[in-house]
């Protein structure tokens, strides 16, 4: 299992808390490096002050980690990583899965739902209606 390092951000108040699910099923950790100490919004509500250098924050859901990543991008912090941690201590790296964020171009990444035509070249749904083909297959 990979050992995660970093200090927990400083917050005055509730972090929304980890659910008991975190001890039974899984929890998530997000790590990032900050050039300076600055206040940011927590996805669970409230605000916290991130430390200069490495930061580590545990969250109950993956979506909270993705949301926090969006917050960090406003601070020009793009080196964040999200991990899934199982109750037995096993850690898996989950985002960005292949090391490149989904919105960036990556050589060799398969195109999903790609249709090689302009929108004006789409077939008319009226012509396809009883042909047995779907508009997304034509």
From Swiss-Prot:
Q: Which UniProt keywords apply?
A: Photosynthesis, Photosystem I
SUPFAM superfamilies listed in its UniProt record: Photosystem I subunit PsaD (SSF64234)
Q: Which GO terms describe its cellular component?
A: photosystem I reaction center
**Protein's UniProt keywords contain Transmembrane:** no
Q: Name one Pfam family in it.
A: PsaD
GO BP: photosynthesis
**Which PANTHER family does the protein's record reference?**
PHOTOSYSTEM I REACTION CENTER SUBUNIT II, CHLOROPLASTIC, PHOTOSYSTEM I REACTION CENTER SUBUNIT II-1, CHLOROPLASTIC-RELATED
Family assignment from sequence similarity: Belongs to the PsaD family.
Q: What does this protein do?
A: PsaD can form complexes with ferredoxin and ferredoxin-oxidoreductase in photosystem I (PS I) reaction center.
Q: What is this protein called?
A: Photosystem I reaction center subunit II
